[in-house]
C-alpha cells in the first residue's frame, strides 16, 4: 500500500511553519516534564474520560508531536503511536522516548491521510487542537473512524469557530466577527498572540462540520466541554479578557459505533459514511 501523504500547499506551508516553531521553542514544542510523567493521567485527563487506567491500550496521539502528549500517555502504560506532519515536532518525540526509555512509535503523516496506519488498530485516539490546520475536517473524522476499533474512544479538541472568526484585539465595539462562517478560505493571518500559530494557515470549521460531521462518520458524542479561560481581572485585549466573550476551544469525547447505523429517511446528508 502506498503510504506517501498527498501534500497540498496547505499541508506544506503548515509543515514548514511548525518546523520553524520548533526552532523557536514554541510552547507546543516543549516535551513532557518529570511532573507530567510522574502522574500522567492527572496531567491530561482531569475529566476522567479515560476511566483511570489505559495500561496496555493501543493509543494514537494524532497531530500531537512535540514530545509531551506521547510521553505522558506512554508513561501511563499505553502503547503509543504519535502522528504529526512536522519532522521537527516528531524529533522531539524521539528524543523524549530515548531519554525516558519509552516505547513510542513515530509516524510522519497528515491527520487527514492516515493510509499508513492499519484499520481498526487503536483503542483510543487523542487529538489536541489542530483540526483548524486542514480545510476539510470531515476527512479527518473519516480517517479516525477507520483506524479506531468499534467502541473505541476519540477525544479531540477544536478551536471554536467564532474564535477563529473574531478579531484578536477589541475595538470600540469590542471583539467583532471579521471572517465569514461559510468559507473555504483560510482566515487572515495574525501574529503576536497565543490564539494563533504564526505562519500557519487556519480554517474555520462550522459546528455542523464538527459535530454533525463526527456523528455522520460513525461516532456517538458522549460529552462536550468548553474549558474555562475567562479572567475578569485580565487587561482589555489579553487572552483571559477575550475568553470572557469567546471560548477559545472545545473538547469532545466521542465513541466509535460498533455497527453501522442507517440514517433517518428525512436526513439531508445522504448515506452515512462508513470506514472500510
Predicted features, each with a name:
Residues 1-32:
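N-terminal, positively charged/glycine-rich alpha-helical extensions of SAM-dependent methyltransferases
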Residues 30-57:
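Conserved alpha-helix/loop element of class I SAM-dependent methyltransferases that forms part
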Residues 57-114:
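Class I SAM-dependent methyltransferase SAM/SAH-binding core
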Residues 112-125:
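A short acidic, Gly/Pro-enriched loop at the edge of an enzyme's catalytic core
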Residues 123-138:
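A short SAM/SAH-binding and catalytic strip from SAM-dependent methyltransferases
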Residues 138-153:
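A short glycine-rich, Lys/Arg-flanked "PGG" loop and its adjoining helix->strand segment in the class I
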Residues 153-189:
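Conserved class I S-adenosyl-L-methionine
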Residues 201-225:
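Short alpha-helix
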